[in-house]
Regions:
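Short coil turns that delineate tetratricopeptide repeat
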Residues: 60, 94, 128, 149, ...
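Residue-level recognition of tetratricopeptide repeat
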Residues: 71, 105, 160, 197-200, ...
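Canonical positions in the second alpha-helix
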Residues: 54-55, 88-89, 122-123, 144, ...
């Protein structure tokens, strides 16, 4: 019996349990279900998904329709269904890098890192020598201004999949490539953050610190403020306590910040403090399980067992 089958069987025995299977099993062996969504946000997600379903129903062979229904299905937490849509896209459009890019992302979400690496590596091979393109946002930021591109997202997620697998050297290589396509402050901050951590985990502190030269307080950050603040902390411009106090809620920023501080402790010889924060993330923020910082904390805890 697999871990997933075991947990489904156990949950079905509980009074009032829902029959739905978990979307994934954590690296620590726990079933992972979609987090509750506020009513207003859910209505918006459902309306957007309904529109995507209509477009897809009319154009099932259109690659854009396939991508959007896969993305819209994933936003409420239906990651397995999203993977099925992207797999259909891979079958119909095997030379479209976008299908592998999006499926690879969702393989990361469900903790299948080998498949994520396979898809994202394939995507990287398909974009070789081709011009980059802006990737439209499914959940636009405050300025309705996309901050990433197809190429940057492919290498960003490939680096992350390697990082989560504990292969920090390959993660660093991917993020070095990602920097070539990180053309705005938000993407520069996000890429530099994970690249810095990968180098730090390799003991390459001089190389890691050299990356921070491009990070300044004046950067016009739209959506990656947590990464930007963490990089400034690594530079010595901000304190860990001030960042943790600022991210004291229960949302994504809290997990992102705590992981960034935990990794900083771990790579600077403060293992006990780092591990304590990792446990705080895993035990205290279960509804944030799809967040990259949460997955990274889970991976670090799992490797240490």
């Amino acid at each position: 019996m697999t871990r997933l089958t075991f947990w489904v069987a156990l949950l079905l025995l509980l009074p009032g349990a829902q029959p739905a299977a978990p979307e994934a099993v954590s690296l620590l062996g726990k079933p992972l279900f979609p987090a509750p969504i506020a009513a207003e946000a859910r209505r918006t997600l459902e309306e957007n998904l309904k529109n995507a379903e209509i477009v897809y129903g009319r154009n099932p062979d259109d690659p854009d329709a396939t991508i959007w229904i896969g993305r819209r299905v994933a936003y409420p937490g239906r990651y397995r269904e999203a993977i099925e849509h992207f797999s259909d896209g891979v079958e119909k459009h095997p030379d479209d890098a976008r299908m592998y890019r999006h499926r690879g992302h969702r393989y990361i979400t469900v903790r299948d890192f080998p498949k994520a690496i396979g898809d994202l590596s394939k995507a990287a091979s398909l974009i070789a020598g081709k011009p980059d393109q802006i990737e439209p946002d499914g959940q636009p930021n405050a300025r309705n201004m996309p901050t990433s591109t197809l190429n940057s997202n492919i290498y960003y997620h490939l680096g992350l999949a390697h990082y989560l697998s504990g292969d920090f050297a390959k993660a660093a290589d991917a993020y070095q490539r990602c920097l070539e396509f990180s053309k705005n402050p938000d993407m520069l901050a996000a890429t530099t953050y994970w690249y810095y951590l990968a180098l730090a985990r390799l003991g390459r502190s001089t190389d890691a610190n050299a990356l921070l030269a491009r990070i300044t307080p004046e950067m016009d950050i739209i959506e990656n403020a947590s990464y930007h603040r963490l990089l400034r902390m690594y530079k010595g411009e901000l304190t860990a306590d001030s960042l943790l106090a600022l991210a004291s809620g229960a949302g994504l920023d809290a997990v992102t910040t705590r992981y960034g501080v935990a990794a900083w402790h771990l790579t600077n010889g403060r293992k006990d403090q780092g591990v304590a924060l990792l446990r705080e993330i895993v035990d205290g923020y279960p509804q944030q399980w799809p967040a990259f910082g949460y997955v990274a904390a889970e991976a670090d805890v799992a490797r240490a067992r």
